[in-house]
């Protein structure tokens, strides 16, 4: 039986994807039946991190090794990820939510609609305040854009008001939020977004 929602989490290396998946699992594990699929190029490091963090039982976490091109495994040939999701859905038929974390990639990465229903795209302030205006599918078309590590703005000379202006211009009415996942700032907005997609749970 398919889960009620398959939610992709994508973004560049180091933007905070795994931190977001960890935080969502901690916040939602009491309310929802959850499972996670992570993607890494040559290891299962993110899956191992989540297992060590104890956010879900290990059998609810699957690590996929994508090889050299992480975006291919979530878009052009997502069969390895579809198989991992399918295994979880077969093992846990009551799943409400499967989180699929992509390997770190560039601003052009996007998920196949065959793999996920919706996508959260994570960028971070440390990459500079110009990132939102550079565009790309993650910036302009993701279902939720998360701009993480706002605490680093003064250290890297990033202007959050510039990021806000450019994000609103690039996304129109699509939702987005600032976060500092290290200390939970803005996480409630992401949790609320996820729960809105599951109104009958």
From Swiss-Prot:
The keyword Secreted does not apply. The lineage of its organism: Bacteria, Bacillati, Cyanobacteriota, Cyanophyceae, Synechococcales. GO terms for cellular component: cytoplasm. It comes from Synechococcus sp. (strain CC9902). Homodimer. UreD, UreF and UreG form a complex that acts as a GTP-hydrolysis-dependent molecular chaperone, activating the urease apoprotein by helping to assemble the nickel containing metallocenter of UreC. The UreE protein probably delivers the nickel. This is Urease accessory protein UreG. GTP binds at residues 11-18. Keywords: Chaperone, Cytoplasm, GTP-binding, Nickel insertion, Nucleotide-binding. Belongs to the SIMIBI class G3E GTPase family. UreG subfamily. Facilitates the functional incorporation of the urease nickel metallocenter. This process requires GTP hydrolysis, probably effectuated by UreG. The gene is ureG. The keyword Chaperone applies. GO terms for biological process: urea catabolic process.
């Amino acid at each position: 039986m398919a889960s009620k929602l398959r939610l992709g989490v994508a973004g560049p290396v180091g933007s905070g994807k795994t931190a977001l998946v960890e935080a969502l699992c901690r916040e939602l594990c009491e309310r929802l039946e959850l499972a996670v699929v992570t993607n890494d190029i040559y290891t299962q490091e993110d899956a191992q991190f989540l297992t060590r963090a104890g956010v879900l039982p290990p059998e609810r976490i699957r690590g996929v090794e994508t090889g050299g091109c992480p975006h291919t495994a979530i878009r052009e040939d997502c069969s390895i990820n579809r198989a991992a999701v399918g295994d979880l859905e077969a093992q846990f038929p009551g799943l409400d939510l499967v989180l699929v974390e992509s390997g770190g990639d560039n601003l052009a990465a996007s998920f196949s609609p065959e793999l996920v229903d919706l996508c959260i795209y994570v960028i971070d302030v440390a990459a500079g305040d110009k990132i939102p205006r550079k565009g790309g599918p993650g910036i302009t078309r993701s279902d939720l854009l998360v701009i993480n590590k706002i605490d680093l703005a003064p250290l890297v000379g990033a202007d959050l008001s510039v990021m806000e202006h450019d994000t609103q211009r690039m996304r129109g009415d699509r939702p987005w939020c600032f976060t500092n996942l290290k200390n939970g700032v803005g996480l409630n907005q992401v949790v609320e977004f996820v729960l809105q997609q599951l109104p009958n749970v």
